[in-house]
């Protein structure tokens, strides 16, 4: 998962002198008080679901009397409640590290009783991934990091460093590989034109990438992030504009597609640490580590 990447933080102190356009006015609305909300998704009705990394509680806005669910998560390092997604039928899916063997699993948690969709690999202290998204064709996509075993990225039998497609109506013993070659693809989103863009974490001082992740092979159309960010979330504002949340920078940054490359285009808001999602009326909801706030996308 792309939270608190220890390796990504190495060398990040050199970014303080980067020149950049000033941030916009502070986010002007608080939606929910959720500490370390690492999983965000929007329901078909326009509501927001936010999952707490360490408690496994899933809260909603507009608020419910009780949490939608409280998952039994294993914690420590980058473990916990990792991802949420809601499809057009109103089914809600959660990815998390379960207690006991600490494997990454995906459940359908609503409506009705929870049902296991996929039992994945054992988690690691870092680079688990676990973000979920619904593809335009309705398929469920999960990103899995290298799990601190980068040598397995090249192994087609291992989930390490891959974006996987999970069926929601059948067994997922061998999920289809959407793309491979990632360090930790926790931050990804589909743009309105159907393309999947990934803001990939990278270890140490290696540059972080913003690249296509839906072409069936290695990352394509690769750009580099302007500074060491440790991306923890990405939201498509349009087909040519993205908002990227940075755990290290604690900013919500704008990137625009220009002549085939993504280029930094200023800071939308400060305080973003754990994720971002586009909500209704042209706004973004982002997690500060203390609460969920909103800001205008433009």
Language model feature labels by segment:
Residues 148-158:
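Acidic/polar, solvent-exposed loop segments in beta-strand-rich repeat domains
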Residues 174-176, 221-225, 238-240:
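Active-site rim elements
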Residues 105-111, 156-168, 212-214:
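Beta-propeller blade signature
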